[in-house]
Amino acid sequence: MPSVARGWWPRRAAAVLAALLLAALAACGDPASGREDVAPAGGQPEPRQGGGAAAAGPAGALAAYVERVKRAQAARAVAARKWGLKLTPLAAPPPPTAAEKPKITFRKGFGVGDPTLPPVFTTVPTKERIVFLTIDDGAEKDPELVRMMDELDIPYSAFLSDYLIREDYGYFKKMQRTGVALHNHTLNHRYMPALSYAEQKREICGQQDVIEKRYGTRPPLFRPPYGNYNGDTLRAARSCGVKAVPLWAAEAFPDHMEWREWDRDLHPGDIILTHFRGREDWKGSMADMIRYVMNVVTAKGYAVAKLEDYV
């Protein structure tokens, strides 16, 4: 879905027109499911019909934005049918402005005694019905995944380990060109708590250097292998520019989900983990995994948003 700068009109002005948006997007239909009520998760604003490009000020900007949303959702419905999804993925609400971004803090019980270190969290604090999709390591390099996600316009973030991606850095460059942010999953995917501070720093900061050299950006996010870390892990990560450490609330496979919480369900802001894997490791392909997780997410009334817009 196209991103739109949000600084030029207040979010509360959008809320005033939310009901009109729902009606407009309902007209788009849902070719993948046969339903007629396709609306964005969390509700999105819609101007009066017939305002046209001549409308000025916030209402005009809103009209242009919603028109783009409608076109994107119609294209997503076509892609959903092509890729075999049962339901058309919902459109995420507009991202927050920089001033509106939620404050990320340590999940309760996940701290290491120093609240100034990069926070470890599994869920982004939000009331929107959105979740975030993240893919780890880089073992499987399926070109179908890049095409599928680009055509479906579903955002995701990749957490990469150099020992797996070095055989084909170009694959992840193609992914990056579609808008995917590439983050740090260490050089060699070692168990961090068993390493000294110096060894952990080499693993984490070395991967920061690799990603910056190969892809032009120094990642602000880091995920430790297996989700295991200690105080040295976070101190080492902070020393080379890491701002936050997203773990996960659920994990996706081609045929099932695994859950962190007792209720075995999604919640607003949950981070979903999956891996770059194929039929050698899974009962299915990367595309099968995306079909499964997106059908679950959409059926539960959630949209996938871009993690970097909120963290």
Describe each region flagged by the PLM:
Residues 1-37, 41:
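Secretory targeting and sorting signals
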Residues 26-120:
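N-terminal low-complexity, Pro/Thr-rich disordered segments
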Residues 33, 37, 46-50, 150, ...:
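CE4/NodB-like, metal-dependent polysaccharide N-deacetylase domain
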Residues 117-125, 166, 282-311:
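C-terminal domain-boundary segment and adjacent tail
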Residues 131-135, 156-160, 181-186, 220-223, ...:
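Structural recognition of the beta-strand scaffold that forms the well-ordered cores
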Residues 138-141, 160-168, 191-198, 223-229, ...:
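Acidic-and-aromatic substrate-binding clefts and catalytic sites of carbohydrate-active enzymes
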Residues 228, 233-265, 302-309:
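His/Asp/Glu-enriched short active-site or ligand-binding loop at hydrolase and phosphoryl-transfer sites
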